[in-house]
Amino acid sequence: LACQAYIDPGDVILVEAPTFVQSVEIFDMFEARCVGVAMDDNGLIPEDLERKIRQCHPKMIYVIPTFQNPSGRTLSLERRKAVAELAAKYDVLVLEDDPYRDIRYSGEDLPPIKHFDTTGHVVMAGSFSKIFSPGSRLGYVVADTETIQHLVDVKSATNSHTSMLPQILCAEFFKRGCYPAHHQM
């Protein structure tokens, strides 16, 4: 959806090296050019990210900050702040793909990159599939109102809607307060 909304053929997307192979396949479908950003045990390296931003002038930065796929690394707190700051400094959209944030059962729970976004450059995407119902293909987006409306317009123009039954079940799951007990299992 983010690609449909923001990516044009030839646009550069900075990605962690390595990154989730299906994301690269989606970016390829939109004829974007992926450029890898180096990582270490604390996730992507901000100095390399800034260097690549200056060299490549990307349209988007794609990052999986928590339990990164395929490495399993988690982006440190300081680096989460740095990503948000660099996005604002260079006016680059960050797609924060954070489907695994709610399956942390030990260690420090870190705020998303979106938490440090003061300029609207970060779009955070999460998933209910990992915590509620695998295969339900339900997710959510956290972004400013203008971005949300743009994404809704693009989704409406390209896909009538996601199946209603999983949406209703997920809504009831949260409305009835089932999530806290489920999350602690």
Task: Describe the predicted segments one by one.
Residues G10, K59, Y179-M185:
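Short, intrinsically disordered, charge-balanced linker/junction segments flanking boundaries
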Residues V37, Q68-S71, V154, T158, ...:
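Conserved short-loop catalytic and cofactor-binding motifs
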Residues N42, L93, V141:
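Residues that recognize and position ribonucleotide moieties
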Residues T118-Q184:
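Conserved core segment of the aminotransferase class I/II
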